[in-house]
Every structure is written in C-alpha cells, then in structure tokens.
Amino acid sequence: MKFAFCLFNYFPYSGLSRDFRRILNECQHRGHEAEVFVRTWQGCQLANTEVTILGDWRDNLSANHDKDKRYYRSLSQKLKENSFDAVVGFNKMPGLDVYYGADFCYIAREQKANHPALRLTPRYQHFFDFEKSVFGTNIQTLILSLSEREKKVFQEYYHTPDSRFSLLPPTLNLVDRKPVQDRSGTDRRIREEFGIAGDALLLLFIGSGFETKGLDRALRALASLPSDLQKRSQLMVIGQDHPGDYQDLAKQLGVGHKVHFLGGRPDIPELLAAGD
C-alpha cells in the first residue's frame, strides 16, 4: 500500500513527532510506501522517505489557524496530483482515512474555559470545523486513540461511534527509558555542567508544548514552596517551545534565577539520573 502521512510540524523532541516516526518506520518495515507532507521540518531528514514541505513565507506572519488552512489547501492539491491508498493524519484536518489521536478535544476545553462569544471568532470556527471533520457522525475516519478518557470526551461532544475508535497502548520506547548505569557519576557531571550544587534539590519539567504541559503551573508551584525548600531548589525545563513568556513569568514570580531552559535534548535518561 501507499500512504500519505500528514503532519503540521515535525521536530525531533516532540512526542507526536516521535510517534509519527515510529509508525512510519513500522509501515516501511512491513513493505509499504509512504510519502510525508509537513508544513515545517526540523532535524535530520528521513532516509528512503520523500518529504514534501508545504510551508509558505506568509506563515511567519500568520496565526496558527491561518497556517493550518493554508497547509491544508496545499496538501489537498498534492493529494489530487498523486494516488494514495490511505491518508493518515497526525493533526485534525478534513479528508483523513486514519487519524492518530494524540490531541485533546478542542471544543471541550474551549467551551469550559472561555466566554461563549469567543465561539464566533475565526480561530474557534477553524479548529471546530477541522475537529468535526474527523469526529463528526457523518465522517468515516478511523481514529487511533491513546486515551479512553479523551475518547469519551470526544464522544460527549461529537457522538462518534465506538466502532471508529481503536485504543492504542502507551507509546513508550523502552530502549530510551533504560536507566543510566553510572547514576552518581552522571548526576555529578550534569550538575557541574549547569552550575548546580550537589546538595541542591533538582526538579525536572520534561515536555515540548509548554502551555499544554502546564509549565506555568510548575513555575507557580516552585514560587510557592516554603522559603527553606525553595532556597535549595532548581528547575530544569527540557522541551522545545518558545520560552520567552515563561522566562518573564519566572522573573515576575521571583524564581527566574532558579529556572534553566535547556531546549529539546536527547539525553533524557541522564537528566533523570541527576534529578530528584
């Protein structure tokens, strides 16, 4: 079979991108073909895989929902020009045969958190339309779901039948999760690299997508610690996102000097060995 794999943004430290790559590799290992369509690509190119980048210069000046619509228009044209047995999406968009559902239900979160008037905005309408194009009752898209809880949330709002969901097990790579052998030596090396005292309490925040993962709450929690505990504490933030607003928040909370933004890194087991 020949698959079209569709993903807005690929970057190596994203959990979604890692899942995308594992599924792509498995399809190829089983003898299938796959062509990849992305808006942006960061990191090393994939061997033996055609990757088409559909980004536009206007994306740098656009809101996310406008970027998504522009990507989808370009993707639709590419899909018309080529013949695929199945279109597999890792973000919500129309026209998918299979959707890998790693994301939360947009309208559930928005309707609980924001004023009803915001439902009239172009942003809300776009994300609702794209979500409905996957989960609507008149759609045939098959959904690979990572969470029984989130599946029920989608069904509450879209009444999607059970028959369209397949629940997947946790996507943990056991090779990457093996503990380091020399924990004490690794601990010492990591702390020396970042100038963190050996008796400091080292806290770790690991995850790309700081808003979704709740980095603001982690910073507020650090700032709320009892003074004697806070004095000993340092926080490492490991993940790929725009840190500016969170660096500002850390400074406003008086803990800016205690927070280290490391960006995305491949040495998570080593960092875990150093953390408390």
Kindly give the residue locations of the regions a language model identified.
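Acidic donor-binding loop of glycosyltransferase active sites
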Residues: 273-276
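N-terminal strand-loop element at the rim of the active site
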Residues: 7-13, 26-63, 78, 150, ...
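Nucleotide-sugar donor-binding and catalytic loop/hinge architecture
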Residues: 1, 181-202, 227-228
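Donor nucleotide-sugar binding/catalytic pocket of nucleotide-sugar-dependent glycosyltransferases
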Residues: 122-187
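Glycosyltransferase donor-sugar binding loop
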Residues: 41, 206-210, 232-247
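An amphipathic, basic-hydrophobic alpha-helix
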Residues: 60-87, 125-133
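Nucleotide-activated donor-binding/catalytic signature segment of Leloir-type glycosyltransferases, i.e.
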Residues: 246-265
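A conserved mid-protein helix/loop that constitutes part of the nucleotide-sugar donor-binding site
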Residues: 17-22, 201, 205-224, 244-245
